[in-house]
């Protein structure tokens, strides 16, 4: 294949014009101690500290990189492309501790990734000439360095370690298909062929112990989890509870085995691997155990609540009973007789009131008789990592229901729905479809699971139906294909293709799409796989997962609302161009290398799907072939970038024409993934297809600490909308504040000096203000000094020890004075109400959540769904996205959202209602933690507190030690600040 240059020049380094800098990356404990530090590393100058940290801490190879290398001579491989090995002769000249180390330059990483792809592409015959291969190598290195695209994490971890450094190790049980014959062979090296795939779908048969069965799946899952990949399976083949077994007896049912798999995944998660087990469990809506599956996580969350509440009640009341048995004034057996001991009677009565088991009460009295004065009863919390969640089931997977059009039509028509047995297709139970739908909606409302996958839509867009149905997805639901296949992902950073004049660089975007399609295709050839079956089918169908990130950021920069016809039209056009180009390139590769092995039997169906994609790209509203739900076609009238629309139409013309002539090299080419970690390494403001979540963020500093910044797209958007530089500065200052009280209204340096503030105290205060979420959190004994607060401000030690102390109010400032100063110093953290900002421009800055304390606006549920629907007709797979819903959303709202997603042609959707998980950080604060148990009045709930608020409140606690009562009640609250866990423990006592 020919490879053109769009970013680089032949004969020049691809890094020419890309500035680099020396940086440091470190991880610190909350106490300031350093856990990890890598200094004097070479990184692109434009990269943020977060991007540098991800690269250095996650993607740099930490060991085994030789200090001296030599090339390996290979026949017909250009000298610049030859693989490298340790130069042992040169290494022996070095001290032993200097011979091997880790990667220390971003260029090393870019070179090993791009070099490995080029090397395997050359060996596989993908390039017409060495010049084309070199152009491919240079263009990819430039795009990586300038954050235009990034592959999924396994590529960064594994790709190129053998080619670039000669790193090798014993085989780990992987397999690879011979590129020429397709014969699957067992790998004899751990590193020669990398494992670049992040997403897997695995089958499971209704068999207990044989290969391909239930227990075998846990082993196959474990092999994937161990290496950081995710997997999904459809468990609908498993018999329901009480179905007959071949050897006699009754099946224990689907749920009993799902709980085993959940435990296995949880054990691996806690076994020291780099990340949680990523797992998707899918069950068809007609399975006899579907109702229990739907409510699984709801019930388990209720168990967590019971464990938390019950353990605390046991601890409190049983120790009260124990203490009452040892109160003074009574002797002998009288102490243990509630008729004689009024304190004991009162304690027993209180315990019975909260329904403590009678035998626990009796056992405690017996314990007291033996002289014991304290019961050690473990108490649990709703922390996600706590023993409470470890105790219950269902916490190690995403759960999804497969629903068919037939089921959804019966929901709307009020019809009946049969749950069918697995062994003989008999009817296990008949219920109203609406009742089951309501159960699904209630479960999603209460616990954010299950998600919904639209089975009919998925399979009507299936390119290879002759080879089998699509039954399942990967853990994030963007990859949907045949069982026992894998997909490797990469995502293009859309903001890097937005020109300064507001136009979209269509040519370079298409060029980049072409190159990264080739990268992913080469990755299929060079990869090794965790099982023989996956190796065989991945070779046979060669599915790819190219996508994009930063759509929300790009639309904001362009001054276009996420929830607008214009925003949706642009998303549709970009997606249409991307997938059209990938299939055109796939057809080009098929011409040179042949179509994928499974193409011929699926040819007619695949071309039908291609024609439907093309119709959608041309904006057609009818004449789709074999589709029950019409897709949302491209709305060219609302897309300002007309060249983008034309390019997408031409791409689909070419994709269909070339495909009809040569077939396709790949059964699928695109998905839209969540782009979490790779979004950070590309400095994306938004991930995948998501909108932004906040306008003001905390930026990490190289030396530690954070400061507030406005989303980088906000000033760009304001300029696009016609605001002048001084207006933009005013709006930004309104949002982020001035970070100082020097010239603030009401509470400023002059006002504080009158209260006794000295220059050194004011200096300490000023240092704390730039990173403060609220000025109240800078006014604390830790910042100002305990002695100053007591001796100068006249605040007693007792008050200084109070966690809820409002020091500003204590020294005489009013609420209105505080609000004026706080807005000046810390900003509104929103642009709503900003001076000079026109109301008609507010939608451009709408985010997934309300911004700051003053923000009221946020994107509605339907805006997320409609955006997904604008892109879905042009995606081979699906879109990974969770729809955020406010805490006030109802069960009916959840059901309506799922129904709208089906009607608009989506393949899958998941919901998250704010506050629907017990483990959601700080959700308890929403009702006010100061509500006493004996309060009779019902008070209005406070607004949800943010993590930064609570974390900074800790600073109000007294720094001197105060002796507390030996026995006191309280609660423990966990938060996460800057990636560090913070535990807030309160003690409540009489004063």
What annotation goes with each model-predicted range?
Residues 1-991:
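Extended catalytic cores of very large enzyme megasubunits
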